[in-house]
């Protein structure tokens, strides 16, 4: 019976690890999603800014304004590059968290299987004991009957 308690404790610990891993995976996915949204926003802003530049150029702009546009576009490109790197890092974090969750889930399933096997074995042993008692009772009853 002590082993049954130990298995239950180990299974409970494994369940907590799975919950913690799932929580971490959720946080990593939210971070990745935010990074994707920020990158999309920057790219959209860059496209909008380029369109404004094209419109202004067709109307004619000064060289100073042209230089300002170019510098700002370069700054946006650097920011986009940095956000792409961040997104790659978040994607790696999600992959690591997902693998960790899968590993912990597999471990939990192993503990559950062991606990089920132990319960089945205990039930089988109890049934055998009951059958043995019934057989002994029937044997004694048969011995007491006068023939």
Swiss-Prot record:
<keyword id="KW-1006">Bacterial flagellum protein export</keyword>
<dbReference type="GO" id="GO:0006935">
    <property type="term" value="P:chemotaxis"/>
</dbReference>
<comment type="function">
    <text>The FliJ protein is a flagellar protein that affects chemotactic events. Mutations in FliJ results in failure to respond to chemotactic stimuli.</text>
</comment>
<dbReference type="GO" id="GO:0003774">
    <property type="term" value="F:cytoskeletal motor activity"/>
</dbReference>
<dbReference type="InterPro" id="IPR053716">
    <property type="entry name" value="Flag_assembly_chemotaxis_eff"/>
</dbReference>
<keyword id="KW-0813">Transport</keyword>
<comment type="similarity">
    <text>Belongs to the FliJ family.</text>
</comment>
<dbReference type="GO" id="GO:0071973">
    <property type="term" value="P:bacterial-type flagellum-dependent cell motility"/>
</dbReference>
<keyword id="KW-0472">Membrane</keyword>
<keyword id="KW-1003">Cell membrane</keyword>
<protein>
    <recommendedName>
        <fullName>Flagellar FliJ protein</fullName>
    </recommendedName>
</protein>
<dbReference type="InterPro" id="IPR018006">
    <property type="entry name" value="Flag_FliJ_proteobac"/>
</dbReference>
<keyword id="KW-0145">Chemotaxis</keyword>
<dbReference type="InterPro" id="IPR012823">
    <property type="entry name" value="Flagell_FliJ"/>
</dbReference>
<dbReference type="GO" id="GO:0009288">
    <property type="term" value="C:bacterial-type flagellum"/>
</dbReference>
<dbReference type="GO" id="GO:0044781">
    <property type="term" value="P:bacterial-type flagellum organization"/>
</dbReference>
<dbReference type="Pfam" id="PF02050">
    <property type="entry name" value="FliJ"/>
</dbReference>
<dbReference type="GO" id="GO:0030254">
    <property type="term" value="P:protein secretion by the type III secretion system"/>
</dbReference>
<dbReference type="InterPro" id="IPR052570">
    <property type="entry name" value="FliJ"/>
</dbReference>
<keyword id="KW-0653">Protein transport</keyword>
<dbReference type="GO" id="GO:0030257">
    <property type="term" value="C:type III protein secretion system complex"/>
</dbReference>
<dbReference type="GO" id="GO:0005886">
    <property type="term" value="C:plasma membrane"/>
</dbReference>
<keyword id="KW-1005">Bacterial flagellum biogenesis</keyword>
<dbReference type="GO" id="GO:0120102">
    <property type="term" value="C:bacterial-type flagellum secretion apparatus"/>
</dbReference>
